[in-house]
């Protein structure tokens, strides 16, 4: 079934059941192929770090597009995104997550300033925003951790949330040897409490970007998009019935 026709039909049946029994529920696919998953009945689809989307070109490669060295490329990502957008417009949402439990952390390849620019992109694109816990404070990928239940190389992206600057990061009162996965033990590990008190922190910037998105219909999930430039800077227009906004990511 190279075109996934049988799989699509199965999920269409599940969507029909869901609409009848749980009309307020939403289905989110982890396919990274919105041209198939949204037709299959999912309300939204994640782009993933593998497959044809070129999502990795933006954040997770030797020369990410959002790196200061400006040696990356968004061309193939934009081309793939536009193709999927044309196929799926009106059928559901294409979502670009900051990360998830299977990917390296954003902060593995990007510093704080670069992360701010990356979040400006993520929070000005169509689709529902998905921010993996801790990405909003720049939690790091922790190297060298013992694999837990098949985590292998993904384990470093699954460490406990860092709430404050206490020894346990505000995560648990348990002894550290009882933790499911070890904490980031770095002395300068970021935490939510400290960043909430800093106007120039990554968390504060993400909070401002979320508020700006919520205040502008063109930037929200269903606002339309058209790309003006796929080089440096990345330029696109977001439009709704109420407004048009030109986004320049530099």
Describe the role of every protein-language-model region.
Residues 1-3, 14-16, 20, 37, ...:
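Substrate-binding/active-site clefts of carbohydrate-active enzymes
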């Amino acid at each position: 079934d190279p075109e996934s026709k049988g799989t699509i039909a199965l999920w269409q049946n599940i969507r029909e059941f869901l609409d009848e029994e749980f009309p307020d529920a939403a289905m989110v696919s982890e396919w990274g192929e919105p041209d198939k998953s949204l037709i299959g009945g999912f309300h939204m689809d994640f782009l993933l770090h593998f497959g044809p989307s070129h999502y990795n070109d933006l954040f997770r490669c030797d020369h990410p597009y959002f790196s200061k060295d400006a040696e990356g490329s968004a061309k193939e990502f934009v081309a793939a995104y536009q193709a999927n957008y044309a196929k799926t417009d009106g059928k559901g949402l294409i979502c670009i997550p900051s990360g998830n439990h299977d990917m390296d952390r954003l902060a593995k390849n990007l510093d704080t300033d670069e992360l701010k620019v990356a979040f400006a992109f993520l929070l000005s694109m169509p689709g529902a925003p998905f921010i993996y816990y801790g990405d909003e404070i720049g939690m790091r990928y922790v190297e060298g951790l013992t694999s837990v239940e098949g985590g292998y190389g993904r384990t470093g992206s699954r460490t406990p949330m860092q709430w404050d600057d206490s020894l346990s990061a505000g995560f648990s009162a348990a002894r550290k040897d009882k933790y499911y996965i070890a904490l980031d033990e770095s002395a300068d590990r970021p935490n939510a409490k400290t960043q909430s008190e800093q106007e120039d922190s990554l968390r504060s910037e993400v909070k401002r970007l979320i508020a700006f998105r919520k205040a502008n219909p063109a930037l929200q999930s269903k606002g339309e998009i058209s790309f003006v430039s796929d080089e440096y800077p990345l330029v696109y227009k977001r439009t709704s019935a109420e407004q048009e906004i030109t986004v320049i990511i530099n």
